[in-house]
Regions:
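Active-site nucleophilic cysteine motif
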Residues: 174-178, 213-228
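Low-complexity, Gly/Ser/Thr/Pro-rich intrinsically disordered linker/tail segments
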Residues: 274-302
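Hydrophobic/aromatic-rich core segments of domains that either
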Residues: 219-282
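Secondary-structure boundary elements
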Residues: 152-209
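Terminal non-domain segments
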Residues: 1-6, 185-186, 197-199, 228
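Extracellular adhesion/carbohydrate-binding repeat motifs centered on closely spaced tryptophans
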Residues: 3-156, 194-195, 238-248, 252-253, ...
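Mature extracytoplasmic/luminal segments of secretory-pathway proteins
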Residues: 1-3, 162, 214
Length: 302
């Protein structure tokens, strides 16, 4: 039977399935980490030593006292940092007085004389101390400590101050305590007099007084002068006359606060222990026309 054309199948009327293309699973992408390497800044321990690194990450290669990051540091010759301890610090021969706790940053003391553990220093504007130098009547050795130039005398004066002065006392109080101690614990003994206007006798007189506990006005004046200097005062002795131009006498003068004041421990001693009269006060006496609290002093230049 013939079928109509519309119902007849064509020879190639097979459905051909489209080719199945498999897409490969995408592999994860390899990402490179872009985290920044920390930049060294400030105080950095590079193994066994400490250095200072600037904000640019470079090591600071300067020497001496430097202001870095708003603080002060001392950089040695090899650029390592000096670690400070409280008090004196020898930084490659220069002594600095550190006012803070231990650490690498430096805290200076106020400029001026400074007593630490029985030693006297003079702090300069940059925090270092005077070394192998003098300021007026005060001489400082290589280690920055005040010295009379005689080790035996220095030790004797420090021992006297240790016995006379209370530890917590101010410098002004210690001066008075030393003065009173000399007046009350040493005795008068007639000894050699020295020419008016000379001062080179002070060391010998002070040493003799410390050794024997006895001496004349030159001994009183010399020993108190060295005590005052050990406390940081600009003190000196005068050989002149008292009461009249023929009465040899010696006393101590101290320059302070724009004035020059007179100290005469031996005259006080005489009124208390020799004359047995009412005590006089010759501690820090101001003068006018040679008169000091009722007593006439004749200076060599007059």
């Amino acid at each position: 039977m013939l079928l109509c054309a519309c119902s007849a199948k064509t020879p190639v009327q097979e459905v051909i399935a489209p080719a199945q293309t498999e897409t490969a699973a995408a592999e994860p992408q390899q990402t490179v980490s872009m985290e920044a390497v920390p930049v060294k800044t400030g105080v950095v321990n590079d193994g066994s030593s400490f250095y200072y690194y600037g904000q640019d990450g470079n090591r600071v290669e300067k020497t001496g006292m430097q202001t870095l990051g708003g603080a002060q540091y001392y950089l040695n010759g090899d650029y390592t940092l000096h670690k400070f301890v409280p008090g004196p610090n020898d930084c490659e021969g220069t002594v600095y007085i550190h006012a803070g706790d231990g650490g690498f940053t430096f805290t200076p003391h106020e400029p001026g004389v400074l007593e630490l553990d029985g030693a006297l220093y003079e702090v300069t504007a940059d925090g270092s101390v005077l070394q192998d130098a003098s300021d007026g009547y005060l001489c400082f050795g290589p280690d920055g400590r005040y010295t009379s130039g005689n080790e035996t005398l220095d030790e004797g004066v420090q021992a006297l101050l240790g016995a006379a002065c209370e530890e917590a006392s101010s410098r002004e109080e210690k001066l008075r305590q030393a003065y009173d101690y000399i007046r009350d614990n040493y005795r008068y003994l007639s000894m050699q007099h020295y020419d008016a206007g000379t001062t080179d006798w002070a060391e010998e007189a002070a040493l003799s007084f410390l050794e024997t506990g006895k001496g004349n006005c030159y001994c009183f004046a010399g020993l108190f002068m060295y005590c005052a200097r050990q406390l940081g005062y600009q003190a000196y002795v005068v050989a002149g006359w008292e009461s009249n131009p023929t009465n040899d006498h010696a006393w101590t003068m101290i320059e302070q606060d724009g004035k020059t004041l007179l100290y005469d421990a031996q005259l006080e001693y005489a009124y208390l222990y020799m004359f047995h009269r009412d005590p006089v006060d010759m501690f820090g006496a101001e003068g006018q026309d040679g008169m000091y609290r009722g007593f006439r002093y004749y200076f060599p230049e007059e």
